[in-house]
Amino acid sequence: MGTITRSSKGLCVAGTHGKTTTSTMAAHLFHQSHVGCTAFLGGISKNYGTNLLLSPASPYTVIEADEFDRSFHWLSPYMSVITSTDPDHLDIYGTREAYLESFRHYTTLIQPGGALIIRKGLALQPDVQPGVRTYTYSRDEGDFHAENIRIGNGEIIIDFIAPDTRINDIRLGVPIGINIENGVAAMALAHLNGVTDEEIRQGCLLYTSPSPRD
């Protein structure tokens, strides 16, 4: 995976929880758009029936960045989402502080010209290189967030807010509350890399959850 991220624009999703859903949703948003992507996922995409998507003409590769055994330190992300940093794998890391330090080091690997999209409120203090933009996201606040959330009749509809745009009336294909926040992160990654507003809206509507992980 390290070689792949050095030879393409790696769009990596890291975090204790939510990375499989977020990376699979991001991959779907890219793959069904004019931008396209290759993707290596930690769960099976129900949209495509596989955890591997190929799009040779696209410069982008979506990857689930796994913190287990510090394997994500081999990556060279162009952009990365960090969803959560709740301590895990303490048999390897030993302490909460060592776990957070591993994520801090991971943020130093994001390449200049790229971006970090980090969930607002995490204990992690990023340490990005000069030239790396940092954005926050969450369900209700941050540079990227949701507004006008409507839940009922078996569906969730949101307005997606970005620093430079607003996409109204996005229907989430999987109407589960946590997918609002995961969806915001995936949409942020897509928006920053040229997926159009209408492609984001259509992609969210048609997205189905991965299996079995998260």
Residue ranges and their predicted role:
Residues T61, F144, R166-I170:
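Short beta-strand segments
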Residues M1, F40-G42, K120, G131-G152, ...:
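Beta-strand->loop->alpha-helix junctions that form or flank phosphate-binding loops
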